[in-house]
From Swiss-Prot:
Annotated organism of origin: Mus musculus (Mouse)
SMART domains cross-referenced by the UniProt entry: Mab-21
PANTHER family: CELL FATE DETERMINING PROTEIN MAB21-RELATED, PROTEIN MAB-21-LIKE 3
Location of the region described as Disordered in the Swiss-Prot/TrEMBL record: 1-25
Protein name: Protein mab-21-like 3
Family (UniProt): Belongs to the mab-21 family.
Biased composition (Basic and acidic residues): 1-18
Pfam families from the UniProt entry: Mab-21 (PF03281), Mab-21_C (PF20266)
Length: 429
């Protein structure tokens, strides 16, 4: 049944990509598609481990080998992934609380300023909230009133600062995942996007959007009587809040985001030539989800492919491989052993990118049938990236995701991962 659904999903997704001509709010089809593939991804799966592999897998995960010998074959997956399951339960509880507060805040923000859209509550996967670490979340707050993305930019120099004053030297051009955002790049715009509180010389300036948004967040915290539960953090270039939950304090980055569905940016030269993964049909489906532009810097908007990445991740193991299980164990090792802490230098998004590059290099099912070999392959890839301080973005390879990371923190992680590779026996806390 799952195969039938994904086959139908690919056909429907391809048809959606052909028919959609105008950018605007993300379609109901795309939202429901993401929720359905996520729900399928959470269904119980059998993780088959042959008896002769027990000791190797136990050594990798630090599980007591004698205890494993006494376990029935069907209970091995539960034993090995028990830490992963515990994490999932804790994150689920935290996510439920975070969603409710974020929905409450953004509903009030949207009431105050119609350019900002409320973040909905979801029973399955919330496409607006991404877990970077157990106590670190990234929340995209959709912006309204920008529809019909054309993507045509005027070639011109910009001589202004955030205050609107004239500069003697032009601003630098965007690099990597960055780009300008002009009102003329859309077929339809609300008149509020032309106001001086966010617009300079026709550009929608992310720093000014963040200034407006920060004030709205502070007002919403007071209006919703959440001052004892939510704190807006100071001295941050973007908007961060600390939130008290039943599992402890978490930090969230609230990022105003322009959603651009059905359009694929020129900077994303994907798929690459002569690559067998993913399939052409899957590529067409994924690209139909488009991309986002996120306010995270002063003058340039940041390209984000969160929806495309989510769909790609959820459909990894249709062939029965163990890619996602390997990723979950890799993430657990990262969070518990190699890179713990509230604001880790390596996040879940970095690990997901490592997984995508490895899947592209090893596209066949045979490469993802032996768990311990597949896991160590991922660990080696992670070690190379961290030790070299270089991890290419999967869709925009010219961008290094570790460029702004702390070098000494990366070196410390690389040392721990190298130690694991020499002696892959780790006791998870």
């Amino acid at each position: 049944m799952a195969d039938e659904f994904f086959h139908a999903g690919k056909e429907n997704c391809s048809e959606q990509a052909r028919r959609s001509q105008v950018s605007g709010p993300r379609s109901q089809f795309q939202r429901s598609f993401i929720q359905r593939v996520t729900l399928l991804g959470k269904l119980p799966t059998r993780f088959v481990l042959h008896r002769e592999r027990k000791q190797k897998v136990a050594a990798i995960l630090g599980v007591d080998q004698e205890a494993m010998k006494s376990l029935p074959e069907g209970d091995l997956d539960h034993c090995l992934l028990s830490k992963v399951d515990l994490r999932r339960q804790q994150i689920s509880q935290t996510m439920e609380e975070v969603q409710k507060i974020i929905h409450l805040l953004t509903t009030e923000i949207s009431r105050q300023d119609s350019r900002f859209e409320a973040v909905p509550v979801s029973d399955t996967h919330n496409e607006s909230i991404k877990v970077l670490a157990p106590s670190l979340f990234h929340v995209t707050v959709p912006l309204k009133g920008l529809a019909g993305y054309k993507g045509v930019q005027r070639q011109r120099w910009r001589y202004y600062n955030v205050q609107g004053a004239k500069l003697t030297c032009p601003l630098r051009d965007p690099e990597g995942l960055q780009q300008w955002l002009e009102t003329e790049m859309f077929m339809k715009t609300l008149w509020q996007w032309h106001k001086a509180d966010v617009n300079i010389e026709g550009d929608i300036v992310p720093a000014k959007v963040l200034q407006v948004f920060r004030t709205l967040v502070e007002n919403a915290v007071r209006t919703c009587h959440l001052s004892g539960k939510v704190t807006v953090l100071e001295k941050r270039t973007t908007v961060w809040v600390a939130m008290e939950t039943s599992t402890g304090q978490v930090e969230l980055e609230l990022a105003p985001t322009v959603e651009i569905p059905t359009t694929w940016p020129e900077k994303a030269q994907w798929p690459r030539c002569l690559k067998r993964w993913p399939s052409p049909e899957r590529v067409e489906c994924i690209k139909s989800f488009g991309f986002n532009l996120v306010a995270q810097s002063a003058y340039h908007w940041q390209l984000s492919f969160s929806q495309a990445e989510q769909v790609l991740f959820e459909q990894l193991d249709e062939d029965g491989g163990c890619r996602r299980q390997c990723f979950q164990v890799l993430r657990q090792l990262k969070e518990d052993v190699w890179c713990p802490g509230r604001r880790p230098v390596i996040t879940t998004h970095h690990l997901q990118t490592v997984l995508f590059w490895t899947c592209e290099k090893y596209p066949h099912l045979k490469d993802w049938q032996v768990f311990h070999q597949a896991l160590l392959r991922l660990v080696r890839k992670l070690h190379r990236c961290v030790s070299q301080h270089f991890l290419k973005h999967y869709f925009v390879p010219k961008s290094n995701l570790l460029q702004s990371a702390n070098p000494s923190e990366l070196d410390a992680v690389a040392q721990k991962v190298a130690f694991f590779l020499k002696n892959p026996q780790v006791e998870l806390p």
